[in-house]
């Protein structure tokens, strides 16, 4: 008979690569998968802006709200450019992310109209800034549109290139005969107001909307403009009108244009085309949700436990969803992979059936370069041949929602486990490299950890906290413990924090009162003892594990 915790695990069902909850069908973004990506994006009459992301990535979580808001505000452009997302943390999408060279999240790629993937079109990366704002996204996107037009593409867009003439005489020279009215927004050189309004109103007939920059000094002088933005209205008879009030914001500027056109018997057109379609929402509640909640509560009561399931899932995720998405691994990346596999081979709690798997991986990396798909094949073969003792899902690292905890939590635990066991297994080895595990972690996070902002933070912290100066194996355990607490302190109260698992300094006074001095300072010797007890090989919990894989003698 199954024990209560094991029964709950069965009832909760598998959550190995769940569909992320950052984007939903009701959002104004197109949800792409491997099943529809090529059908929608390749040879499309419109351009596409695709964000490649992972739902667990903190930077992606911060990026999602402004990206969705941008999609909403750009909805009138939908016949020109589609705003979409594709989740690379869903294993089914790995081939797409690998083929398009997506190794850091979030990555936004622009695919111009009529892209041909077989011809080598992989899209162009659109810069992103931190902190992320809707305005920054718009600015970078519109600059991309302008670059496309300057390079002879972007034929679907209205004219977004700056008006360069010194007067208005040639304004209509390149316009069709049915264009009767022109609106020229003269603005600061770092403004994109004119371009945004031109895109919003691109379907309005008989009208062209252009923009000029204030560094066009001859035009500014000839029109006697002293304030920016200024709206210049011109018709075919060269009648001009200059408006400087109530046009600083998009809504006001569009209202001014609409009012002028209404007096001419014309109406602005700002229709929003339909979306191409999305994954459908399940109208029924998840019958397994209650079991999952109960399971989390049971696991939480077990305290600071380390589960074999989290360690194995972390390793498989790292190899299948990060290393494998790199199309070709060579140079520094390959050296980092070798170092990572070296500490995995030495210290990871594999079962007895793992020798050929880990040897095949290390032999693969002995060449000058490795294809990511080769790593994927070896891990999938290992899964099929019983190398791993657990299903691919998180247990102690399962968050209250799919976007919380998960892989980052398990990766921290994996490296804590490796640092502790490098101490325990090298007691008599005075020549052991004190930064063997930390160096492998640094290389992995730098070259493979796909949350770009997280990777940058860790690399910066490693430099500031002198990772390379660690002089003993026990010091490496404490270095990583302190670094993790620094991250916990920085992320406490952040939007990425799981409300059911608030960030705390670890270990808590409740779990390890002896770790605290009377004045609240850390007693590091006690902390080290606690970490050794927690992460020692014989402390690992095997809930949900097939122990016959780990300890074959048990079935006799």
Q: What kind of region is each of these model predictions?
A:
Residues 2-47, 77, 81, 86-91, ...:
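N-terminal leader/targeting and pre-domain segments
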Residues 28-34, 52, 64, 72, ...:
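Thiol-based oxidoreductase modules, predominantly thioredoxin-like and allied folds used
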Residues 35-74, 164-203, 434, 438-448:
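Local sequence-structure signature of Cys/Sec-based thiol-disulfide redox active-site neighborhoods
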Residues 48-49, 67, 83, 103-126, ...:
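A short, hydrophobic beta-strand/beta-hairpin element that forms part of a small beta-sheet core
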Residues 170-236, 240, 321-326, 337-347, ...:
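Non-catalytic interaction/regulatory modules that flank or connect domains
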Residues 177-179, 203, 218, 222-225, ...:
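Long, low-complexity intrinsically disordered regions in eukaryotic proteins
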Residues 417-537:
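Alpha-helical bundle/repeat cores within regulatory domains of eukaryotic proteins
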């Amino acid at each position: 008979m199954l024990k209560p915790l094991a029964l709950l695990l069965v009832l909760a069902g598998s959550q190995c690569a769940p569909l992320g909850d950052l984007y939903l069908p009701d959002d104004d973004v197109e949800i792409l998968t491997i099943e529809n990506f090529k059908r929608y994006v390749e040879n499309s009459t419109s351009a596409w802006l695709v964000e490649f992301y992972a739902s667990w990535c903190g930077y992606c979580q911060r990026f999602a709200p402004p990206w969705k808001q941008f999609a909403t505000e750009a909805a009138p452009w939908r016949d020109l450019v589609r705003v979409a997302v594709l989740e690379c943390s869903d294993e089914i999408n790995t081939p797409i992310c690998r083929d398009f060279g997506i190794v850091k999240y979030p990555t936004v790629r622009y695919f111009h109209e009529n892209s041909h993937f077989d011809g080598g079109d992989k899209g162009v990366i659109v810069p992103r800034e931190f902190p992320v704002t809707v305005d920054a996204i718009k600015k970078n996107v519109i600059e991309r549109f302008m670059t496309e037009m300057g390079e002879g593409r972007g034929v679907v867009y209205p004219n977004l290139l700056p008006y360069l003439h010194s007067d208005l005489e040639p304004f209509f020279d390149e316009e069709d005969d049915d264009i009767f009215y022109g609106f020229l927004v003269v603005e600061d050189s770092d403004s994109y107001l004119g371009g945004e309004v031109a895109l919003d109103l691109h379907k309005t007939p008989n009208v062209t909307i252009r923009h000029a920059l204030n560094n066009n000094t001859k035009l500014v002088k000839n029109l006697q403009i002293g304030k920016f933005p200024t709206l210049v209205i011109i018709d075919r008879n060269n009648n001009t009108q200059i408006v400087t009030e109530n046009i600083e914001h998009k809504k006001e500027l569009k209202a001014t244009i609409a009012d002028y056109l209404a007096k001419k018997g014309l109406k602005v057109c700002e229709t929003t085309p339909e979306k191409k379609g999305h994954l459908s929402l399940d109208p029924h509640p998840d019958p397994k949700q209650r079991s999952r909640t109960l399971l989390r509560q049971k696991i939480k009561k077990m305290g600071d436990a380390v589960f074999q399931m989290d360690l194995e899932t972390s390793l498989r995720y790292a190899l299948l969803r990060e290393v494998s998405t790199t199309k070709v691994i060579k140079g520094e990346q390959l050296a980092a992979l070798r170092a990572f596999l070296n500490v995995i081979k030495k210290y990871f709690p594999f079962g007895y059936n793992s020798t050929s798997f880990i040897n095949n991986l290390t032999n693969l990396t002995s060449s000058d370069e490795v294809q990511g798909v080769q790593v994927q094949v070896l891990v999938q073969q290992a899964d099929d041949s019983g190398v791993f003792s657990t299903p691919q899902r998180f247990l102690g690292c399962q968050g209250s929602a799919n976007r919380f905890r998960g892989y980052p939590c398990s990766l921290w635990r994996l490296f804590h486990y490796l640092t502790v066991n490098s101490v325990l297994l090298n007691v008599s080895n005075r020549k052991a490299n004190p930064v063997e595990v930390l160096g492998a972690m640094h290389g992995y996070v730098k070259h493979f950890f796909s949350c770009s902002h997280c990777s940058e933070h860790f690399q910066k912290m490693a430099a500031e906290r002198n990772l390379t100066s660690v002089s003993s194996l026990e010091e490496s355990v404490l270095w990583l413990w302190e670094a993790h607490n620094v991250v916990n302190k920085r992320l406490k109260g952040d939007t990425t924090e799981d409300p059911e698992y608030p960030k705390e300094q670890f270990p808590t006074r409740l779990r390890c009162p002896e770790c605290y001095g009377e004045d609240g300072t850390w007693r590091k010797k006690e902390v080290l003892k606690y970490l050794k007890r927690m992460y020692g090989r014989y402390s690992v919990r095997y809930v949900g594990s097939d122990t016959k894989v780990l300890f074959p003698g048990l079935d006799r």
